[in-house]
Amino acid sequence: MESQASENGSQTSSGVTDDYSSWYIEEPLGAEEVQPEGVIPLCQLTAPPALLHACLASLSFLVLLLLALLVRRRRLWPRCGHRGLGLPSPVDFLAGDLSWTVPAAVFVVLFSNLCLLLPDENPLPFLNLTAASSPDGEMETSRGPWKLLALLYYPALYYPLAACASAGHQAAFLLGTVLSWAHFGVQVWQKAECPQDPKIYKHYSLLASLPLLLGLGFLSLWYPVQLVQSLRHRTGAGSQGLQTSYSEKYLRTLLCPKKLDSCSHPASKRSLLSRAWAFSHHSIYTPQPGFRLPLKLVISATLTGTATYQVALLLLVSVVPTVQKVRAGINTDVSYLLAGFGIVLSEDRQEVVELVKHHLWTVEACYISALVLSCASTFLLLIRSLRTHRANLQALHRGAALDLDPPLQSIHPSRQAIVSWMSFCAYQTAFSCLGLLVQQVIFFLGTTSLAFLVFVPLLHGRNLLLLRSLESTWPFWLTVALAVILQNIAANWIFLRTHHGYPELTNRRMLCVATFLLFPINMLVGAIMAVWRVLISSLYNTVHLGQMDLSLLPQRAASLDPGYHTYQNFLRIEASQSHPGVIAFCALLLHAPSPQPRPPLAPQDSLRPAEEEEGMQLLQTKDLMAKGAGHKGSQSRARWGLAYTLLHNPSLQAFRKAALTSAKANGTQP
């Protein structure tokens, strides 16, 4: 009996076990987990990112050491070579003749890496930050300090990549080729193995890396080309002296007679196309022969375009795919959800589904339209601001006073001017990012309000809230419109008369009566104008937030605008330190033929007979030598004219020596 009971118990338990196991027969077992639909699995690279970045960091440090040895060997004085290594400069921002392509590409690569830090859980690739458990049982990790450290790591990582171009040597070009190929190869390898990423959007990492890949690809082609050219033309020793091609071209363009092509045809005889071209030429930036924008302005413009792309991409992929998923998942249950809030769109549930989907599609279209409008306005204002930069720099170069509020008191460098010059590109990039974000919010609210208050009600014939409000308040709007129209008509036909060709005020009594009677109505008009003033000023400041060449504050408070203050100081440094006219004049002085060195003269106390006879012969042949000294005389006059120009041009005051202020006649100093 006991055995039977035990058998029955075992059968019962096994049966129960079989019954329980049948409950989970459709569940995935063990490691055979199925990913939900639409979820991108985490991709594992063949080589760990920590190992790749450790190799890149080591290679960059080695290249930097080799460049330091090269700079110490080539550029430092031999007697000072044992004191330390010469740190190569990544970019010479004040040089006018250097190519802007390599610095712009390096800055694009650096900024793109910083943009990729936003969704990354590991700011430093060679550190694997694991989440720590909090006392509440939740997983938390403080990544803020590591992201701040990454802001210093990436500039140090790409420092040698930019310094190889500024060294201008065959060995530097070879090191730049190896380093650029290594960076480009690692990025291509990572994106080829893992093109999709579950963070934010599956293709966001790949799309955000396009500027990075373009910049590294350009550098991986530029360095080999420069290496081949240096080997072919034997220019490995580098160029010596001042680079004067741009400064001499600027001087020739400045001194040559200008062609007045625009004045040859009257404005009345121009066609519509020519007028449009002239308007665009005066409104946006077009290249001008003989003038080149400073390197920092070119870099800031490039970074503004890159920042616009990165911010627009982030705004697009973080909202539009989510709205599309929500629209695709709408079913008849949404009618019950809306009914819970007291919203009944229709009695037919299927019609409610179609209406909700159409409204979501309208929101998506308004969002994309606002994003396109924001990007277009940013690019147009960027092109227009480049023309303003050029006009301001040309005015400072010729010594004119700029129409700035407050005006520049002096172009001498100062502490604030140097700090502003250092941070100009970074400020411009940050202002562009924030300006695009604010523009997107304002334009999206405007387009959405216009769509749901005007277009959607007119298409569906329901929810005509705007038309109903106008229907109920039409007496107010009619009164305001009539008051404004009648005041303008009375001002033109009753209170003004033309006397001897000049307008004069008349009917003063009627003018005072109308002013008193219309005071309450004008208060209503003033309230409307106040709202319009707030809207138009907000829109204007939003659109021009990314521009630093104009102040968003009134003239009396323009100095409180940090962006405008930075721009003024930036112009001060550029005008005082990279004046192309000064560089050209100094190059002409350095390249001028120097007189032949003469042997040192003996003391003048006693002359030997031979020297006395030689002096007599020189006195006799003075007239003959004066005939052949015409060329030297003209050269001396040209040098005196150059010195006079350098001394009296107000835009060149920063280049004068302080000793010239106390100079005496014939150059003798006290």
Swiss-Prot record:
Record membrane topology: Multi-pass membrane protein
Modified residues (Phosphotyrosine): Y644
Post-translational note: Phosphorylated on tyrosine residues in response to RBP4 binding. Phosphorylation requires the presence of LRAT, suggesting it may be triggered by the uptake of retinol that is then metabolized within the cell to retinoids that function as signaling molecules.
Intramembrane segments of this protein: 511-548
Extracellular domain ranges by topology: 1-50, 119-144, 190-205, 318-368, 445-474
Interaction with RBP1: region residues: 235-294
Remaining remarks: The retinoic acid-induced activation is impaired in retinoic acid receptor gamma-null F9 cells.
Comment block on domains: Contrary to predictions, contains nine transmembrane helices, with an extracellular N-terminus and a cytoplasmic C-terminus. Besides, contains one long helix that dips into the membrane and then runs more or less parallel to the membrane surface.
Subunit structure: Homodimer. Interacts with JAK2 and STAT5. Interacts (via extracellular domains) with RBP4. Interacts (via cytoplasmic domains) with RBP1.
Role this protein plays: Functions as a retinol transporter. Accepts all-trans retinol from the extracellular retinol-binding protein RBP4, facilitates retinol transport across the cell membrane, and then transfers retinol to the cytoplasmic retinol-binding protein RBP1. Retinol uptake is enhanced by LRAT, an enzyme that converts retinol to all-trans retinyl esters, the storage forms of vitamin A.
Protein name: Receptor for retinol uptake STRA6
The organism of origin for this protein: Mus musculus (Mouse)
Primary gene name: Stra6
